[in-house]
Amino acid sequence: MIDSLDVSYGDMWGSHEGPTHPNPIPNALAARRHEAGMAYAVLLSSRERPLAMVERWPRGMWRVYLFDDATRRVRMIDFKPFGTGMLLAHRNTRLTGGDEETSTVEVLSCRAPEFGDWQVFAPFLAQQGHEPAPTVVLNDVSVDEGAGPLRPTGIEQLFVPGPRDTPDGPAVVELGDAGAVRITSGRLAVSDPGWVSEPRTVTVPPGEYPVTLALLRRTPWLRVAAAKVTLLDAPPHAWEMALRPDEDPELLGEGEFYGVGVDTGTVAFLDATRTVSEEALDEEVFLPLSFDDRPGVELPGTETEPNLIAFSAGWGDGSYPVWIGRTEDGQACCVVVDLRLYPSDEEKQVPGGPKPSHA
């Protein structure tokens, strides 16, 4: 009979298989995500053996996975809101070697849990042959609160030319002039040029601003390690992550960040009002950037629209942090995209290296 469960928290598992979280998070971070209606996972274990993994989904949906003795997820129970403050178990699926077999659920409903109220799911352990005691004690074994979101360490060093040690061996940083981006609307956008409808924006005075590329050269390749728009001829006193209005850094785990999402292997600086046709992208951006000796390209403006400066995104698709450098009096003096070709000194000290991001 199971009278106690160890509780830990993490990001959603996806296709991960194993006895522990692929990316554990602290109790306090999970609680903040719960309050914000965001997704997270709860692992319920006994004697270091996983019994159930509970996933909190948007719109009040929940999912419980049950494990077998070999720590494989073999059963999946889906819950949806039912009445006031209740959940209905509407689907019970047996997972067998890639196949799914649906059966009835013996316990049809339970309370919708408040954060930490995981005893409500204990009766469902019986679906896998476990007998919970009338009262189940929960023991919090989640990881300690870490250092928080990714910090802007070493941003200035990205643009210092000279030799570098990288995970792939020695390389050299060179600086390249990518031209000047013209901003007419007062909003500088950072975006994948193929998806300019959802950019990350920074408020700047209208004008033309030089774009500098930090190029990492290691025979036989040349990659863009970072890109910078210089807004003022003044050094940054502090750095801040470029955020959308609905983004809260308090909801990020250790080493995580909100960044610009990339699906075409390309990032661009542009005015927030600029639109781009697929034909222009293919012929004037993606094709030129496909050559190794062409890391950056300008898509010229028209009579009605300003130009666009595009460049290859590090190793390709993914998400990359955007940092705003501010002077001592708070003015934005530069905007930098770190394309993450090599970890900062801070990340080298974090177990597992760079953490997941949110585009």
Stretch-by-stretch model annotation:
Residues F115, E131-D282:
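Extended, low-hydrophobicity segments enriched in charged/polar residues
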Residues S45-R47, E55-G60, F79-G83, R217-T219, ...:
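Short, flexible beta-strand-to-coil junctions
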Residues L43, M53-V54, V211-L213, A227, ...:
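Generic structural hydrophobic/aromatic packing signal, biased to beta-strands
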Residues D3, L88-I155, G255-E256, V260-A359:
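Acidic, proline/glycine-rich low-complexity IDRs
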Residues L66-D68, F79-F82, A89-N92, L188, ...:
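Surface-exposed beta-strand edges and their flanking turn/coil or helix-capping segments
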Residues M38-Y40, P50, V224, P306-L308, ...:
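Short, surface-exposed beta-edge/turn micro-motifs
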Residues M1-T135, V211:
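Buried hydrophobic residues that stabilize the cores of well-folded domains
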